[in-house]
Amino acid sequence: MTRLWPEGEPVETWAEEGVPARFYWNGVPQHIIHICNRWRVHTRWWEPGHTIWREYWKVVTDKDLLCLLYQDLLSSTWLLARLYD
């Protein structure tokens, strides 16, 4: 069953030159072994205080998790948006 967090679940993430390398999920380190895709979303820029500017990363970890992470580019925080089965 796919798990989805519409607002994102904060995760401690380490990035190398802006590319996520690992993150912690439930206290377990997840090393990213493959990046499947990445894209940016920049919307609601016309509404002060409501701008959404994110960079999404679909990744595979060394624990065989397929995940969708994103970095909020306004706050520099990393969040987990989805875990796929």
Question: Predicted segment positions?
Answer:
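Non-catalytic peripheral regions of nucleotide-handling enzymes
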Residues: 1-85
